[in-house]
């Protein structure tokens, strides 16, 4: 029986029954739980993206996912600030208007001037003029200056006449070895100057260097004097290819042969120019004539001169994938293949005793007979990503193909069957993810392959099983040449370095700053003269020799 004298139990006060001062103190504490949780979620997402295995082989996807996680965090915080802070309506309105004004003000002051190979945006002041716009007026009087005598028919062993050098494989033979210590004997600046936009390299014959560039609303093929950087002639055509992620201007590198220049523009115009004046000898609209669409990032195929033919990748259907023209007259000789193009260039090779033209297309690597274009063999190359690196013939019957975007590389065996027909099979059990060049090329030296792994590091790959011997350094999405027993590596940031080409260890010997800004263009080495460029500036350096 209850004691009637006992006091009734005290009931816990409800939140609304708390004194107003206590409720006011409790509300801010609860209010900050959500933004703290949102920030924790954002941090967790970024941590997962940076460490999950899916992104280990693709830095660009990793960066995009990181930016997405940060963007989602900011949006959630903004949503909370506007709708759930408990602030008066007027204060929330001011917060919204202030945030929009801040973003609009920021966007009115800066613009995205391209991205790195890993999709890191480059921000510049909106009023900053573009490099090609500053140069547009300088090319108004295109053509050969009256006092210039230009002869591209005189060749030498020092020439670098096409994409990736004399043999189109990134290997440069020098008569005298390069000095290995640039701190003691630095490269000499011959000239350094602005240039129009584009990702073309230089082709060099004798004292002349030819490249392609964008100047204002015109796509140009330009001839410079190697010793001075003086513009000798220019051929300009209306046209302007531009993509935010891929940049603007031409992508391919001209080919010099027999005193003429063969150049393919980003929109598919193939020109044969007189090397003495830059005047048009013949021209073709490769895309229109072959019913082919342009590529997302523009035509990047550097024309291959093979005997009397000029060969380019058109990418058209119904036998119009690869096209060959008579290099003298421009008449079409043959067209063959059905594969859409990608971003590589034709390469002549001899495999299994048969001379053939190799081309990496969007879905396959294909070999064509140079005489008539007939497809000799085809190997499907996985993935829907851009295929940029050149195939690398190895020995008598093997070829290495490679790609970035998390795909890696594969070694193929090319064999002739009893009927003489060629076929390709995999020499490794699976694709090697130890080397994933995105839009750079690899070089072969004494049975080992060297290349840049998806913007992360330089890699030496053993060809027996596709295993990595070493990795080192950081060169971004740069480019590479083999010079004797040295790797000349150009970084994405514009540095040029020398690295020993040995499977024993990674060892960078020396480096210097050659250019400023994003540098995707391939370097050209003609004798002791190194010509480099990017979308804003070009330079020529005299390298010291041993």
Question: Where are each of the predicted segments found?
Answer:
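Membrane-embedded alpha-helical segments of integral membrane proteins
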Residues: 36-86
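Internal/C-terminal transmembrane anchor helices
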Residues: 89-114
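Aromatic (tryptophan-biased) beta-strands that constitute blades/sheets of beta-rich domains
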Residues: 126-195, 220-243, 279-292, 331-336, ...
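Extracytoplasmic beta-rich repeat domains
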Residues: 184-186, 190-205, 215-218, 234-255, ...
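Conserved blade-register residue in beta-propeller folds
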Residues: 221-223, 272, 322-324, 367, ...
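Blade-level signature of beta-propeller repeat domains, shared across WD40, Kelch, NHL, RCC1
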Residues: 407, 518-546
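Loop/turn-rich, solvent-exposed surfaces of beta-rich toroidal or solenoidal domains
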Residues: 407, 432-501
